[in-house]
Amino acid sequence: MTAILDIIRDFRTAQGEVFRIEGTQDGPYAAVDPRHMRIEAAAGASGRIVVVHTAPDMSSLEIVAAEDARLEITEVFLAEAFAEIAVKQSARSLCRLTAVQLTSANASYTIDLDGRDAENMLGGVFLAGGEEHCVVKLRTNHNVPDCRSNSYIKGVAGGSARGEFCGLVYVAPDAQHT
């Protein structure tokens, strides 16, 4: 676990309750144990952020991608955290989410595709052993036509460990070709 923290030590720090991304970022940012954080990507901006949970706390992460924004968010759970992640995407935005649970954790994702040609990709893995319990919940809302989403969750649980996945893709009545 310390190897992961050593790797991100050289990343720039994403601090504060609101982290704004303007333009194109050269390298990744890291946020360690955010209690509440809002990530805002301006129109046409792009960036990469690694969020690491090292303490058994509640966490709330809100991600807002404006038109043509590109975001890559990696979330790593090293402690029994409870995280709620809300993503709101505008037209032609792309958000790639990667979730890695290496211990008991509970992550709940709500993704709103609110603009045409918005695209969301979520990939996740959990590894649970002993008495650990990993939970991943996902709700993807296709609120407008011509959106795309792709979700892929895999898990391994050994011993008495348990893993849960609950997912729903909602397509609004007028959201055709999505």
Model-derived features: positions:
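Conserved beta-strand/loop scaffold segments within soluble protein domains that form the structured core
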Residues: D6-T178
